[in-house]
């Protein structure tokens, strides 16, 4: 059975690769992004440009484009990484990461909740860097704090959407070879996306609100 799958941040990296894997299994993919890419256009999915999930106009564009779409799977993947240290704090980049990594996914889910079918799935692409107990190296203040906030929002969503039997998956993709980390990761975007799509396929109500690595292991908060 084909699902309607909506993915944010879909023009490159993990988002692009997830579009590819969902399409390969027969799903109808709606790829949301600010600007498309050649690689995304070649996938022959439904590309919706002009979607900046951190802006009012971008969210309005999203609502208009998806007004008649019943969503089975919603993947909030858009995110950014900036670098701050204790000696070089930049409150502007910390705020920017909160807007895009934490507030925007929550806003996307809240705005599209009327489009979500009963029994739908919401996947939030987070990071183990948002784990408090797993933080053994410090630094990366904005990224760590914003992903911890996303994890907290995801847990609340898992409770608030339960009445519609909507399951919420909270996923760390791994250290992925993407532009965000200058391609210095240890797993390709395609391999990570394949694992994530597999986890989303298997997501059930009893696993809602569980923080998982793309390899399937449960991560600590």
Language model: regions and residue ranges:
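Structural signature of the Rossmann-like NAD(P)-dependent dehydrogenase/reductase core
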Residues: 7-8, 76-77, 121-127, 167-172
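N-terminal Rossmann NAD(P)H-binding glycine-rich loop of SDR-like oxidoreductase domains
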Residues: 11-20
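Catalytic loop of short-chain dehydrogenase/reductase
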Residues: 85-94, 121-162
């Amino acid at each position: 059975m084909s699902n309607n799958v909506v993915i944010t941040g879909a023009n490159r990296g993990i988002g692009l690769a997830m579009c590819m894997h969902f399409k390969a299994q027969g799903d109808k993919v709606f790829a949301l992004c600010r600007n498309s890419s050649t690689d995304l256009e070649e996938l022959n999915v439904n590309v919706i440009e002009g979607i900046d999930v951190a802006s009012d106009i971008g969210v309005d564009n999203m609502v208009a484009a998806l007004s008649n779409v019943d969503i089975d799977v919603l993947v909030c993947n858009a995110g950014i990484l900036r670098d701050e240290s204790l000696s070089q704090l930049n409150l502007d980049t910390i705020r920017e990461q909160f807007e895009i990594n934490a507030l925007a996914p929550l806003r996307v889910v809240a705005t599209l909740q009327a489009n979500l079918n009963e029994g739908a799935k919401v996947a939030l692409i987070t990071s183990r860097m948002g784990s408090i107990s797993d933080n053994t190296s410090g630094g990366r203040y904005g990224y760590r704090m914003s992903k911890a906030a996303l994890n907290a929002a995801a847990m609340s969503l898992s409770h608030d959407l339960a009445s519609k039997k909507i399951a919420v998956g909270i996923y760390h993709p791994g250290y992925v070879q993407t532009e965000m980390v200058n391609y210095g990761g240890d797993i390709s975007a395609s391999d990570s996306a394949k694992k994530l799509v597999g986890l989303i396929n298997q997501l059930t109500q009893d696993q809602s609100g569980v923080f998982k690595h793309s390899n399937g292991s449960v991560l600590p908060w």
